[in-house]
Swiss-Prot record:
Belongs to the urocanase family. The keyword GTP-binding does not apply. Transmembrane segments: none annotated. Keywords: Cytoplasm, Histidine metabolism, Lyase, NAD. It comes from Ralstonia nicotianae (strain ATCC BAA-1114 / GMI1000). One of its GO terms (molecular function) is urocanate hydratase activity. The active site is at C456. One of its GO terms (cellular component) is cytoplasm. This is Urocanate hydratase.
Length: 601
């Protein structure tokens, strides 16, 4: 396409507005009739803050084409409707479009959202794209269309937990051969000071992680690796994404080329320094080269994974040999989508084969939930699933205890409100050294994007305690404004995704999606502030269903009652799901917390 055609295409696209720069309001002045609707009003806008979203002028928040609203007219109408919404009404949003306001009651959700849901036979990208081109549909990803995205921080702790557990499983009894002689596994010579880039007690000191993808989700990888004590190399095909991660301090430095990257890896591994390195290039081209060099005696990674947007072969994965400009032009032309998808799929197969090659060298290799194994399998890589997904490999024991990506946002816009809530979490859980260390690392290393927010994995029995404590802080005036509490859809009981969160369930119920539907119904009945039900997040059309929940702590007694219900029920539904599948840890957790599970004694 020529420049004139590109400009005309953008001018005609109702989802693009070059003049828009959206930021959520701060402070205590209300634009809506209550803090409950004000919270949705601010969080929708926060999702499109240029410091938060990947491509805000296109309404894209993260994850390929994960949008906050269907088009700009819908965005404006949602805000207008929220400003007028009464406390006994609920707004219904269908794939990013406000379609109705109905009389409910004060404890009902103020917003109910359904995004990207298709009847199973039609749940594929071809049907989605046909509807999307007509302006009839929207891809909501997980937290994009449910208005609770907080930037890369939203996934950084989960990625950190994954990397740290991988270190414990694979390397707890053997320090890295790259560490200089005389250095301890903590990266310190006896009697010496410790570099600020060294992480004490890490099983990954002197080791490096190889991955790709620096988008909204993948962008958490370098910082997560650093917090876990590892060196990391993340390949990314777009310089703008590398620049974004450098600017927000998720990435430490960029290598000039593959040789420079390997030299930097060796330098920092030898010193036990946890440093993240970005490399501009195509993973389908660079991973095979790294395999070749490793086989020839070069550096071998200690862990291999990937977070490219392989779930969306049109908008998410650059085919090998293509320029970014060619890729963008093909995305804009529906006639090229079939060819683009085919080329991207072939490249994914090459990418996965390289990951399998690393696994054959004895290197732990794990899928991070972007469906790239499925794409490769469909392309003829019949052993694509030889390496596991990250949930069954490292995370499921946490899910069995109702632990997951609990998050909260300060509607005041004041970072001090977050720091005060950090302190409150430490006070509530004085003996949880893991949570204390996480909060200390987060404050030191994580830059806020948009409204100040915090991610902290908490479990059943902890989430509601935190929510009630925050509500009391608001009531007493210790915080400047109410707190929004939410989570990722990637959580203990809110998702069915056979190639990711529910892969390899003990009872074989990987694809049973009753559970996220029950989760959404339960949170609606409990009085959440807004509830969402999505399809296709993370792994693409046809491969997942998942639910989101958000609840506001506004300091009122009514909020306290809702928080006590919703934050117990939400985590409890995850424990229920895993107990039903036969996980003893979940059964024990259910009994400790007094859950009533009729079929489990």
């Amino acid at each position: 396409m020529n420049t004139m055609t590109d400009a005309a295409h953008l001018a005609a696209d109702p989802r693009y507005d070059a003049a828009r720069e959206i930021r959520a309001p701060r402070g205590t002045e209300l634009h809506c009739k209550s803090w409950l609707t004000e919270a949705a009003y601010r969080m929708l806008q926060n999702n499109l803050d240029p410091d938060v979203a990947e491509n805000p002028k296109h309404l894209v928040v993260y994850g390929g084409i994960g949008r906050a609203a269907r088009d700009w007219a819908c965005f404006d109408k949602i805000l207008e409707t929220l400003r007028e919404l009464n406390d006994d009404e609920s707004l219904l949003v269908q794939s990013g479009k406000p379609v109705g306001v109905f009389k409910t009651h004060p404890d009902a959700p103020r917003v109910l959202i359904a995004n990207s849901n298709l009847v199973p036979k039609w749940a594929n990208w071809e049907h989605f794209n046909a509807l999307d081109r007509k302006g009839l549909f929207m891809y909501g990803q997980m937290t994009a269309g449910s208005w609770i995205y907080i930037g890369s921080q939203g996934i950084v702790q989960g990625t950190y937990e994954t990397f740290a557990e991988a270190g414990r499983q694979h390397y707890s009894d053997r320090p890295s051969a790259l560490l200089k002689q005389g250095l301890s596994p903590e990266g310190t010579a006896p009697g010496s000071g410790r570099s600020s880039a060294q992480v004490p007690g890490s099983h990954l000191a002197g080791r490096w992680i190889l991955t790709a993808g620096l988008g909204g989700m993948g962008g958490a990888q370098p910082l997560a690796a650093t917090l876990a004590g590892a060196v990391s190399l993340t390949i990314e095909c777009q310089q703008s994404s590398i620049d974004f991660r450098l600017r927000t301090r998720y990435l430490d430095k960029q290598a000039r080329d593959i040789d420079d990257a390997l030299n930097l890896i060796r330098h920092h591994c030898e010193r036990g320094e946890a440093v993240s390195i970005g490399l501009l290039g195509n993973a389908a081209e660079l991973l095979p080269e790294l395999v070749r060099r490793a086989r020839a005696g070069g550096l071998k990674p200690d862990l291999v994974t990937d977070q490219t947007s392989a779930h969306d072969l049109v908008n998410g994965y650059l085919p090998a040999g293509w320029t970014v400009e060619q890729w963008r032009a093909a995305q804009r032309d529906p006639a090229q989508h079939a060819h683009l998808s085919a080329e991207a799929a072939r490249s994914c197969a090459v990418h996965v084969q390289a990951m399998l090659d690393f696994q054959s060298m004895g290197i732990p290799t794990v899928d991070y939930g972007n469906n790239i194994r499925q794409v490769a399998f469909d392309q003829g890589v019949k052993n694509a699933f030889d390496f596991p997904g990250f949930v069954p490999a490292y995370i499921r024991p946490l899910f069995c205890e109702g632990r997951g990506p609990f998050r909260w946002v300060a509607l005041s816009g004041d970072p001090e409100d977050i720091y005060k809530t950090d302190a409150k979490i430490k006070e509530l859980f004085p003996h949880n050294a893991h949570v204390h260390r996480w909060l200390d690392m987060a404050r030191e290393r994580i830059a806020f994007q948009g409204l100040p927010a915090r991610i902290c994995w908490l479990g059943l029995g902890e989430r509601h305690a935190a929510g009630l404590a925050f509500n009391e802080m608001v009531r007493k005036g210790e915080l400047k404004a109410p707190i929004v509490i939410g989570r990722d859809h990637l959580d203990t009981g809110s998702v069915a995704s056979p190639n990711r969160e529910t892969e390899a369930m003990r009872d074989g119920t990987d694809a049973v999606s009753d559970w996220p539907l029950l989760n959404a119904l339960l949170n609606t009945a409990g009085g959440a502030t807004w509830v969402s039900l999505h399809h296709g997040g993370g792994v693409g059309m046809g491969y997942s269903q998942h639910a989101g929940v958000v609840i506001v702590a506004d300091g009122t007694d009514a909020a306290a009652r809702r928080l006590a219900r919703v934050l117990v029920n939400d985590a409890g539904s995850g424990v229920m799901r895993h107990a039903d599948a036969g996980y003893e840890t979940a059964v024990a957790c259910a009994k400790r917390n007094g859950l009533k599970l009729p079929m489990i004694g």
